[in-house]
Amino acid sequence: IISVADSKQFVFDPKGISTTQYDNFAQEATPYTLNEFIGLVQQHHLENLLAIDVTASKTFVENYLPLVENGFDLVSANKIANTIDYPFYKKLRETLAQYKKQYLYETNVGAGLPLIDTIKLLHHSGENITRIKGIFSGTLSFLFNTYSASEAPFSEILRKAIESGYTEPDPREDLCGNDVGRKLLILARELDLENEF
């Protein structure tokens, strides 16, 4: 790992980030732009580059195209890139193909289950998928199951879900159905449907 960043600051070390640097991120991080970061990567002739996005940020998704164009493969838990406007979705895939880069996002739907890959493989093998059924929100499942089995107020159960890390960074995304909607759109687009969110 040569860099750790948030939306405004980063730590960069071409020899690898130490645990001390990581632990002291708040003190050691400096402001950066994507162009400065890419410049440092090129200056040090780094290879086998991988950008990992564990945010829920639309702003960071805007970095995907320049990262791919500068030699990065992508791994993302962020659903935004697969659910914003279809022209961006298509452009990202074209850019990945042009630069022969990979984009792994299996955790977008189904947590650790290989649901996206399975749907994609079935579709590409000629299967006509007409329906997908399941529980698409672990958060809502937890909330409803816990609420129906206890006397606790819903707000207390929600607080527990947030503290346990079950919700999206903004729990309103779960509660208003946006998270489920994004997951369903991701699966629809894997079936070559050009739907929008």
Q: Which residues are covered by each model-predicted region?
A:
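Glycine-enriched alpha-helix->loop->beta-strand junction motifs that scaffold or abut catalytic
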Residues: N70-L74, G138
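Core active-site phosphate/anionic-ligand binding loop and the adjoining beta-turn-alpha structural block
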Residues: P87, K100-F197
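General beta-strand structural signal in soluble alpha/beta enzymes
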Residues: S3-V4, L50-D53, L74-A77, Y103-T107, ...
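A generic secondary-structure micro-motif detector
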Residues: D53-V54, N82, Y147, D174
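A general structural motif
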Residues: E47-N48, G71, K100, I129
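N-terminal glycine-/serine-/threonine-rich beta1-alpha1-beta2 phosphate-ribose binding loop
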Residues: I1-N70
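Rossmann-fold NAD(P)-binding glycine/threonine-rich loop
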Residues: T55-N70, N78-T107, A111-L122
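Residue-level "edge-of-site" marker
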Residues: V4-S7, I80, V109, D174
